Amino acid sequence: MENFHQQEHLECIQVIENNIMEARATSRYNRQSARKIRKVLDNVRQYRVGDAINYLHFSPEKASVVIEKTIRSAVANLMQIEGNNEFDPNTFGIKEAFVNQGPVMKRFRAASMGRAARLRRPSSHLTIVVTTE
């Protein structure tokens, strides 16, 4: 079977309506189930970017590292679109944050009495959209 490695695909969306811009960052093939990432993501969705990064940095969850990295990537994309290198975390907000299920690697483990037990190694895709609103 294939080995899935975490990839980060960066897409930039530029929307100019009343000087509101947004950017997107996607982290794919995260080696954690979508359900476990969604548990942390539900807490972060309501925050501004600065508060979300602060919450995630001190969170003990494994998923918080991936989410924080993706948020920082989306903010960097937005600053690149704007052409502004000054980062004020309270000026950016999280517009969308969702996680989808990725491919599942299936492995077999030896079980008692000559049987084999199937192990599922889930992965997930995380998408974050940041806006200047």
Feature locations, PLM:
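Short, solvent-exposed beta-edge and connector elements
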Residues: 32, 112-113
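C-terminal binding/interaction regions
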Residues: 105-106, 116, 121-133
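Short, low-complexity, polar/charged sequence segments that are solvent-exposed and flexible
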Residues: 75, 113-117
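A short, conserved strand-capping beta-turn/loop at the end of a beta strand
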Residues: 98-111
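Ribosome large-subunit tunnel/peptidyl-transferase-proximal elements
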Residues: 2-4, 9-99, 125-133
